[in-house]
Amino acid sequence: MNIVILAAGTGKRMRSALPKVLHPLAGRPLLSHVIDTARTLQPSRLVVVVGHGAEQVKAAVAAPDVQFAVQAEQLGTGHAVRQALPLLDPAQPTLVLYGDVPLTRASTLQRLVDAARDGRYGILTVTLDDPTGYGRIVRDASGFVTRIVEQKDASPEELKIAEINTGIIVTPTAQLSMWLGALKNENAQGEYYLTDVVELAIEAGFEVVTSQPDDEWETLGVNSKAQLAELERIHQRNVADALLVDGVTLADPARVDVRGTLRCGRDVSIDVNCVFEGNVTIADNVTIGANCVIRNASVGAGTRIDAFTHIDGAELGANTVIGPYARLRPGAQLADEAHVGNFVEVKNAVIGHGSKANHLTYIGDADIGARVNIGAGTITCNYDGANKFRTVIEDDVFVGSDTQLVAPVRVGRGVTIAAGTTIWKDVAEGVLALNEKTQTAKSGYVRPVKKKS
């Protein structure tokens, strides 16, 4: 089977410099969703017709299995499909999809393909309570499809028809070239409509069949930011429903967003306003507090992530405790039972088994062993303005509050670092490290008093 995806439109109503098919739905371009669905049908040829912003669209979705045809002028859907003909296998049927219709299920498309076997012409239709704006399916007294009429060209009687054309079709490819060549642009838009091919197929004696999706929203397209927002919410609700079916507890299914792939184990609980981006894996018995953002991360079993935590590109072991208000940046690796508390940032660092950094700390480019305590206000000074350096803290080290570790530096096993110490040299195992200071008390000191006006 050939699949052609039309993605050449300008999208004027989006009021954006970004090509319409590249606007994100759940964090990925609309067109990417359509291509992914198309791939599940295992086409022999997959062709995307580009036009407006062609190079930008190509760059966004380029892949070995995707070919591109260019529609230099936007002269209608029939003209767009014509540009793809040289890339198609004429011996295989062609399924036509749209780059701005991202939610159609693969099963819906497969039913249409099955209905159109043996050289039939298939149309995906929907019956709507309000069909305003859509092309109508015109049938004869026996119920056979005779033509499709666009809203702007429909008569008053035809406007009463509730069954509409979604634009998604399956057609014999060998005849499609001839039919497209016979199209005329004698309509209100002055365009070559793909919908007019159905009349030519009927005239040629081809049987026209129809199929409908399980849900109306499967064929909704995007022509404005309002419609994009509507589809986003539909998609997110579908994702939430799937999570609930899998046993995930969602405090409010309407207030969780998944912008990528989220895989959850058993007994996972997610509070409100959480966002998951990229590829996220969550093991069993994980609790996630409100307003967390988790991106491209893996979370070990039994972990608790408290509210307002941001995790990006991190790996969390089992039974870790994170947050609230913690930030784990790319390269953060936490071993089992590690704790990272409020206003702690970890970047490109390993924190060992049972180690804790509970308050107001920056750990960057560091290797921290097991059972290490990092006091509040500790900073690994990893950057000299040009280069990054690593800090190594071995097992069982106690780091007092307000400590600065100036990398590159190594702190040996079992060291105790006194509060307020700056470490700029390696520290041997088992010692107390401190910067000796003198505390002075001056008698007779008078605190300044603010003058009253």
UniProtKB/Swiss-Prot annotation:
Protein family per UniProt:
In the N-terminal section; belongs to the N-acetylglucosamine-1-phosphate uridyltransferase family.
State if Cytoplasm is listed as a keyword.
yes
For region N-acetyltransferase, the annotated ranges are 247-453
UniProt pathway annotation: Nucleotide-sugar biosynthesis; UDP-N-acetyl-alpha-D-glucosamine biosynthesis; N-acetyl-alpha-D-glucosamine 1-phosphate from alpha-D-glucosamine 6-phosphate (route II): step 2/2; Nucleotide-sugar biosynthesis; UDP-N-acetyl-alpha-D-glucosamine biosynthesis; UDP-N-acetyl-alpha-D-glucosamine from N-acetyl-alpha-D-glucosamine 1-phosphate: step 1/1; Bacterial outer membrane biogenesis; LPS lipid A biosynthesis
User: If you read the UniProt record, what top EC class would you report for this enzyme, in one word?
Assistant: transferase
Q: Can you say where in the cell this protein is located?
A: Cytoplasm
EC code: 2.7.7.23, 2.3.1.157
Report the protein name in the record: Bifunctional protein GlmU
Region annotation (Pyrophosphorylase) maps to 1-225
Natural source organism: Burkholderia cenocepacia (strain HI2424)
* Residues covered by region (Linker): 226-246
What InterPro entries does the record tag this protein with? Bifunctional_GlmU (IPR005882), GlmU-like (IPR050065), GlmU_C_LbH (IPR038009), Hexapep (IPR001451), Hexapep_transf_CS (IPR018357), MobA-like_NTP_Trfase (IPR025877), Nucleotide-diphossugar_trans (IPR029044), Trimer_LpxA-like_sf (IPR011004)
